[in-house]
Amino acid sequence: MNQTLDNIVSLAKQCRGHHHYDISIEQIVVSHEAFNQLAAYLRYKQYKKVVVVADNRTFTAAGRSLCDKLKNESVLYTVCLIQSDENEDVIADERAIMQVLLETPNDVDAFIAVGAGTVHDITRFSSYKMKVPFISVPTAPSVDGFTSMGAPLIIRGVKKTIQAQAPIAVFADTDVLCQAPKAMIAAGFGDMVAKYTSLADWQFAHWMANEPYCPLVYQLTIQSLNACVDHMEDIAAGNEKGIHVLMDALLQSGIAMLLMGQSYSASGAEHHLSHYWEMEFLRQNKRQVLHGAKVGVSTPIIVEHYQRVFWPLLSELKQRPKSMDETIWERLKIYTDSIQELLESLPSPERIRAMVEKVGGAVAPQQLGIDPLLVERSLKEAHRLRLNRFTMLYCLNECMLMEG
């Protein structure tokens, strides 16, 4: 990572910007020797019985070799292969969680999540409910949620992020990561590019709604984003240096969330659009699209919407809309210039699309099978998925366009 785990803990103790949550992660390894160090970690923790959670693809990519290592270490293990749905998608929903809980022995010492975001979300929630720790083994640099506490789950068809627990350790084998599908690498880059708008929404929410804000968490996140942009060529090439930079950035972004105890820094309106599209795909029984691919598309859409719709409307307001709270109105007047500077600091939608396209990601909704009408609807409704987040999209829809 850009910062070592110990450095981040030290910086958090020095930071006075916010009350930080304890980082429960004891070890992070991103190297060729990750599985050997995982075995040593299990010996150190004296874990004798574990459940390996994976799906068919991730078990082939890393689970089988990991189980061989466990066998050599005389660690008893149960393999839980998450069943896919009729579209061959693995979904983090009630069915998957119930499968893990039913297949887990009562005397298990720890879970090991072998996979990408979805497998981790399922394992994170299941282990939390069983009051058992889990260890992260990422198989692709595809999301920034590996080290976070939040578990985005589909509950009765609705996307909800439930606070659960972070892994106690992360062991990412660079050989495995470099073999990840190009689409998953592009998705990881897309999840980092999304920080442009998530950080802007967070700053706006702090100004308008006094939501918690921490300069250290902001700095860790922007540092991770900049590292990815600076090494875009290597990430696009899929070489070891690029994959290492991307994985480090994703892990550090997740640790930043962990410090806050919330995902303010990493998830704004661009994520709400992504979740809205995901729910619609589930309703239509369509194959799912990688989370990072969706936010790679939604981020420039949000930038464009903020710069061409939100800002012009805000700058022309002469009196308080009936639907706007008096306090919000007063703060908007105070921070108008700051909001303008914030929006002007964002890369253009064209620049963001060029970056995502450079690493092989989709840049238009149609490339992901997302209908323009769905995009239009999500810009009006997606903020309702997180009504406790005062994003610019929320302000636009709930405070500025709700007259009458």
Swiss-Prot record:
Its EC number is 1.1.1.261. It comes from the Bacteria. The lineage of its organism: Bacteria, Bacillati, Bacillota, Bacilli, Bacillales. Catalyzes the NAD(P)H-dependent reduction of dihydroxyacetonephosphate (DHAP or glycerone phosphate) to glycerol 1-phosphate (G1P). The G1P thus generated is probably used for the synthesis of phosphoglycerolipids in Gram-positive bacterial species. Keywords: Cytoplasm, Lipid biosynthesis, Lipid metabolism, Metal-binding, NAD, NADP, Nickel, Oxidoreductase, Phospholipid biosynthesis, Phospholipid metabolism. Binds 1 nickel ion per subunit. This is Glycerol-1-phosphate dehydrogenase [NAD(P)+]. CDD domains: G1PDH. It catalyses: sn-glycerol 1-phosphate + NAD(+) = dihydroxyacetone phosphate + NADH + H(+); sn-glycerol 1-phosphate + NADP(+) = dihydroxyacetone phosphate + NADPH + H(+). Homodimer.
